[in-house]
């Protein structure tokens, strides 16, 4: 999957984007501008409505039809803002080709999912780069649309196996968390 796409991609920046996402106007150019402003930025993802880490933000829409207007309002209120993160979920990420060439392909030992994104983030950190969530980009995510088709027992077995493999490489895994909510 991802490794084949990354190897075939051309251009100075690479994007991994799941098929269970809906992007908004200007998302790609806005991500690109952050890289142009910060040469130490190694990986960047958008804010989103639904994910198991700090990229999730409160959204003001109830339907996909309302999403573009609500996303525009949110992103305009957060223009230029980056939220530093140690681990991004790969439902939507961008990286410079130079970073990909230093870090290399994703570790295929992880197989179908769980921890491959955590592992890749550790490898990016090893090369001296940092990661962030671009709060001025919002991408809608229908969380785990394809993974929900996997049997619960099989999913748990894959999680435990990959967690063990990740920890053999990097030490104890720190569970993802959501960011603290802002008080107005």
PLM feature spans:
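Short, high-confidence coil segments that cap the C-terminus of an alpha-helix
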Residues: 11, 38-41, 129
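A recurrent flexible, glycine/aromatic-enriched loop bordering the glycosyltransferase active site
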Residues: 7, 50-51, 55, 63-98, ...
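A short, conserved alpha-helix in the catalytic core of glycosyltransferases
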Residues: 26-32, 80, 84-104, 109-138
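Catalytic metal- and UDP-sugar-binding loop of GT-A-like glycosyltransferases, i.e.
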Residues: 17-19
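Active-site-adjacent helix/loop segment of glycosyltransferases
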Residues: 52, 58-59, 118-184
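Glycine-rich, basic loop-to-helix element that forms the pyrophosphate-binding segment
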Residues: 1-9
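Conserved donor NDP-sugar-binding/catalytic core segment of glycosyltransferases
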Residues: 21-60
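Short aromatic/hydrophobic "clamp" motif used to bind/position activated sugar donors
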Residues: 14
